[in-house]
């Protein structure tokens, strides 16, 4: 049988840094108010780079690190809710920029679960035997979706990209997976709505910026995500002691605290970087993974079991247990 493994990781964030104190200069907030509620102190905001620019930086790093030629890449999946345009896909721009002429490329929209969903799909593509090498990238410029007068959401989000190179392997590395969607709760977190605008249509006012029911999302993360992780471990016969690190979507430090208690995994196993990046949606998990590899916490030698878990708009949530 053929399986997939993560062989390389990379991340990139825009240079411009916006601190909580910077935000306090343009809206009614303070560092203390933001940090005590979220664990976020600063975030990177793009000055002139688009989502594709961030993703291309990651793809270039993955190619360089791997030593592969661009035409060895079979597919590129970009998870994003903030593409440059609805057409062409962000992934198509990445494919062109790195000259991966043999690769097919497409975007995936699953909000903050996007990287996990895309990684699960990429694993199946390689397991099919038809493809050998693929890139999965989470990339966002959420700053263009934020209402900068709304302190409830503007303080949360940042821009960035992270990704992995998947290669075919004779050993199984994706050990367990669970993916979920509940569209009945979609109005809890929305952005980028469009309206009908033809001469033959009756349009309604569209909601362009991020709108969030914070309490509903907080409760959803604690309840549904915790339950799905516990079920995943039970069904796969993987215990909390088997897990080396938990890399969850970086939405809010309080959410991580509560999920750690719910699933009874030591809090120190939960890596975090939202203090420096904020919520980067589909990019948060791969950025966290890339940094953990840089720091030597995760070794990429196939000996560690890592829980990856994303949750967000849709509502969507999903988890993978991978051997890295």
Swiss-Prot record:
Its EC number is 2.3.1.180. GO terms for molecular function: 3-oxoacyl-[acyl-carrier-protein] synthase activity; beta-ketoacyl-acyl-carrier-protein synthase III activity. Its main location: cytoplasm. It catalyses: malonyl-[ACP] + acetyl-CoA + H(+) = 3-oxobutanoyl-[ACP] + CO2 + CoA. One of its GO terms (cellular component) is cytoplasm. The active site is at residues 112, 249, 279. InterPro entries: ACP_syn_III_C (IPR013747), ACP_syn_III_N (IPR013751), FabH (IPR004655), Thiolase-like (IPR016039). The keyword Transferase applies. Keywords: Acyltransferase, Cytoplasm, Fatty acid biosynthesis, Fatty acid metabolism, Lipid biosynthesis, Lipid metabolism, Multifunctional enzyme, Transferase. Pathway: Lipid metabolism; fatty acid biosynthesis. One of its GO terms (biological process) is fatty acid biosynthetic process. It holds the Pfam family ACP_syn_III_C. SUPFAM superfamilies: Thiolase-like. It is an enzyme of class 2 (transferase). Residues 250-254 are annotated as: ACP-binding. It is found in: Cytoplasm. Belongs to the thiolase-like superfamily. FabH family. Homodimer. Catalyzes the condensation reaction of fatty acid synthesis by the addition to an acyl acceptor of two carbons from malonyl-ACP. Catalyzes the first condensation reaction which initiates fatty acid synthesis and may therefore play a role in governing the total rate of fatty acid production. Possesses both acetoacetyl-ACP synthase and acetyl transacylase activities. Its substrate specificity determines the biosynthesis of branched-chain and/or straight-chain of fatty acids. NCBIfam families: fabH, PRK09352.1. PANTHER family: 3-OXOACYL-[ACYL-CARRIER-PROTEIN] SYNTHASE, BETA-KETOACYL-[ACYL-CARRIER-PROTEIN] SYNTHASE III, CHLOROPLASTIC. The last Arg residue of the ACP-binding site is essential for the weak association between ACP/AcpP and FabH. This is Beta-ketoacyl-[acyl-carrier-protein] synthase III. It comes from Streptococcus pyogenes serotype M4 (strain MGAS10750). The lineage of its organism: Bacteria, Bacillati, Bacillota, Bacilli, Lactobacillales.
């Amino acid at each position: 049988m053929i399986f997939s493994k993560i062989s390389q990781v990379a991340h990139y964030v825009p240079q411009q840094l916006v601190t909580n104190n910077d935000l306090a200069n343009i809206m009614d907030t303070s560092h203390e108010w933001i940090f005590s509620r979220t664990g976020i102190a600063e975030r990177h905001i793009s000055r002139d780079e688009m989502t594709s620019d961030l993703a291309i930086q990651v793809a270039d790093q993955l190619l360089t690190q791997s030593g592969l030629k661009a035409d060895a890449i079979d597919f590129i999946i970009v998870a994003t809710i903030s593409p440059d345009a609805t057409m062409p896909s962000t992934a198509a721009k990445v494919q062109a920029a790195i000259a991966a002429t043999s690769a097919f490329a497409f975007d995936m929209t699953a909000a903050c679960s996007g990287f996990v969903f895309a990684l699960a799909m990429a694993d199946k593509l390689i397991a099919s035997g038809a493809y050998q090498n693929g890139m999965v990238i989470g990339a966002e410029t959420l700053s263009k979706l934020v209402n900068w007068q709304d302190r409830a959401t503007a303080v949360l989000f940042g821009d960035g990209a992270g990704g992995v190179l998947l290669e075919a392997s004779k050993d199984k590395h994706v050990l367990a997976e669970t993916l979920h969607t509940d569209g009945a709760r979609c109005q809890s977190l929305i952005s980028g709505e469009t309206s009908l605008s033809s001469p033959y249509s009756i349009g309604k006012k569209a909601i362009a910026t991020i709108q969030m029911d914070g309490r509903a999302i907080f409760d959803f993360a604690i309840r549904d995500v915790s339950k799905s992780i516990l079920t995943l471990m039970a069904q796969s016969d993987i215990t909390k002691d088997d897990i080396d690190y938990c890399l969850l979507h970086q939405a809010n430090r309080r959410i991580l605290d509560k999920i750690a208690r719910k699933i009874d995994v030591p809090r120190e196993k939960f890596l975090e970087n939202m203090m420096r990046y904020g919520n980067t949606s589909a990019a948060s998990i791969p950025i966290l993974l890339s940094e953990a590899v840089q720091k030597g916490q995760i070794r990429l030698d196939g000996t560690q079991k890592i829980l990856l878990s994303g949750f967000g708009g849709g509502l969507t949530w999903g988890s993978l247990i991978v051997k890295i």
